[in-house]
Design a protein with these regions (language model features):
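Short coil/turn connectors between adjacent alpha-helices in alpha-solenoid helical repeat scaffolds
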Residues: 107-114, 159-165
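N-terminal low-complexity, intrinsically disordered segments
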Residues: 97-111, 117-125, 133-137
């Protein structure tokens, strides 16, 4: 069992106890113990996209295509490309590129229902939402924090347009966000 699995299980148990009314005043101390139990892991190589110029061209092409059609769509490969580029250290790619494009895609209803479900789960996968989170300060923060920001846009889009995510999907997200908040030590993660 990984450190993340252990913390996920502990947080779920605490949430269950809280929902049963068995803990309340003790919860902050219990969460503090979870935070104190986190072990720093050795740094490992971080996969960061290095194709900034190509990425910007591709992002602009998708933006242009979406704005020029009355029935916008995005391919699964394009979604994978965009998710991978949330890890970019270049703000022109990550912030003004991928992040803005995802929001445009949500607003244009360019995703299929299946793509929404798949992307929602993908952004919460351990290798995305918790990317290098146990290691010393590193650039994995960009993938973590921007995945969380895209999730917030997805939730809004789902509630106002798509309506395909289930109560179980939302509860799993609450769990993951609670764990993220406990684990994120780097201030850039709360931008």
């Amino acid at each position: 069992m990984t450190q993340l699995d252990t913390i996920q299980r502990t947080v779920q148990q605490l949430r269950d106890l809280l929902n049963k009314g068995e803990i309340f005043t003790a919860l902050p101390n219990m969460l503090g113990k979870v935070i104190e139990s986190v072990a720093v892991e050795p740094a490992t190589p971080i996969k960061i996209p290095r194709d900034d110029k190509t990425a910007i061209v591709k992002i602009r092409a998708i933006q242009k295509r979406i704005k020029q059609t009355s029935d916008p769509s995005v391919t699964d490969d394009e979604i994978d490309f965009l998710v991978a580029h949330l890890a970019s250290t270049n703000p022109a790619v990550r912030d003004k590129g991928v992040f803005f494009l995802f929001n445009d895609l949500f607003q244009a209803e360019a995703f299929t229902n299946e793509q929404i479900k798949t992307l929602f789960k993908r952004l919460q996968a351990p290798d995305i939402l918790f990317n290098h989170i146990f290691e010393p300060q590193n650039n994995g923060i960009f993938l973590r924090s921007f995945s969380l920001m895209i999730l917030s846009g997805m939730i809004y889009a789902d509630q106002n347009r798509y309506r395909v995510l289930t109560k179980a999907d939302y509860l799993a997200t609450v769990q993951n966000i609670a764990v993220f908040i406990l684990l994120e030590k780097e201030g850039r993660g709360y931008v």
